[in-house]
Curated annotation (Swiss-Prot):
Site (Transition state stabilizer): 66
Other information: There are 73 peroxidase genes in A.thaliana.
Organism for this UniProt entry: Arabidopsis thaliana
Protein name, as recorded: Peroxidase 20
Residues involved in Ca(2+) 2 binding: 198, 252, 255, 260
One of the record's GO molecular function terms: heme binding
InterPro entries to which the protein is assigned, alphabetical: Haem_peroxidase, Haem_peroxidase_sf, Peroxidase_pln, Peroxidases_AS, Peroxidases_heam-ligand_BS, Secretory_peroxidase
Binding sites annotated in the UniProt record for substrate: 167
Cofactor note: Binds 1 heme b (iron(II)-protoporphyrin IX) group per subunit. Binds 2 calcium ions per subunit.
Length: 336
């Protein structure tokens, strides 16, 4: 696995070379090695504590990756997702896509505590999220990439935005495409970032609609997933009734502990767990998405390269830089 990761890393050198800096909304750049002088051990502190957290709870890797996704899709990559409800401001944590679903806040809290001890008011919570996502992917066998740093933290959260912009597990393909386009992301980004579902788990409430047999008289196409009756029965036994809505099943049934390309192999076999996974193939009437899914299924290196490119794009959505926002002392609250 280490050899494979090194091979992909070498394939990404050209990509890194052209992304050593990215401008924020007001012209201040995100940079490689942003904390080299102000907090030289920042990236090492994050890396070490992500390693500890994932060793203790392997599922935490997917949870931390998901945290950055849910942050960037609401207001931008500004750590607004980490803010608790305070006064008149409702936390994004309470929004429907996040409630009883997002995890890993305590890991970010502890890393922030250590960074404040080492370098007070220097490393932003939004940069911690970006580094944590990268390190989590790498720890599960995925690619490594240079995270450009220098983000600052927002002064507000958007409960309404979290309900509006975070894709639902039962999203149609059209709604996913529109949702990603609103963030400046294209169809290739949608496919590549969906590959993050190669790790992690989902609750029964998120996918039990996929288990119920359709009324074939009202169905214009056969959901490939439903042809796998054994797969369906196994999942159905976990989600018999509403009392089991919080039971968990791996998003990738084949290699749930590894960040690899099996998610795309599963899609081609009709074994995507969520509706929003399956529609990448079942609702792609033109075949463009199916072709890319097939390419990723047979070429893991290509998936890794495109995934990194899309993560870099996502990590730069509406970032705050320069004098915008602040560096929070505590990721859960704006500074007083």
């Amino acid at each position: 696995m280490e050899i494979k990761q090194k091979k992909v890393w070498l394939s990404l050198i050209v990509l890194y070379a052209i992304t050593t800096s990215v401008l924020g909304d007001f012209g201040e750049p995100l940079l490689k090695g942003f904390y080299k002088e102000s907090c030289p051990l920042a990236e090492e502190i994050v890396k070490h504590n992500i390693e500890v957290a994932v060793l203790k709870d392997p599922r935490m890797a997917a949870s931390l990756l998901r945290l950055q996704f849910h942050d960037c899709f609401v207001l931008g990559c500004d750590a607004s997702v980490l803010l608790d409800t305070h006064g008149d401001m409702l936390s994004e944590k309470q929004a429907t896509p996040n409630l009883n679903s997002l995890r890993g806040f305590e890991v970010i809290d502890y890393i922030k505590y250590l960074l404040e001890e080492a370098c007070p008011l220097t490393v932003s919570c939004s940069d911690i999220l970006a580094l944590a996502a990268r390190d989590s992917v790498f720890l599960r066998g995925g690619p490594w990439w240079e995270v450009l740093l220098g983000r600052r933290d927002s002064l507000k959260a958007s409960f309404a935005g979290a309900n509006q912009f975070i894709p639902a597990p039962n999203s149609s393909l059209d709604s996913l495409i529109i949702n990603f386009k609103q963030q400046g992301l294209n169809i290739q980004d949608l496919i590549a970032l969906s590959g993050a579902h190669t790790i992690g788990k989902a609750r029964c409430v998120s996918f039990k609609q996929r288990i119920v047999q359709p009324n074939m008289e009202q169905t214009f196409y056969v959901d490939e997933f439903r042809r796998h009756s054994t797969f369906r029965r196994v999942l159905g036994s976990q989600c018999k009734d509403s009392s089991r809505d919080n039971e968990l099943s791996p998003l990738d049934i084949k290699t749930p502990a590894y960040f690899d390309n099996h998610y795309f192999i599963n899609l081609l076999e009709g074994r995507g767990l969520l509706i929003s996974d399956n529609v990448l193939v079942s609702e792609d009437h033109e075949g463009e998405i199916f072709q890319k899914v097939w390419e990723y299924a047979v070429n893991q290196d290509l998936f890794f390269i495109d995934f990194v490119e899309s993560m870099l794009k996502m990590g730069n959505i509406n970032v705050l830089t320069g004098i915008e926002g602040e560096i929070r002392e505590n990721c859960r609250f704006v500074n007083i």
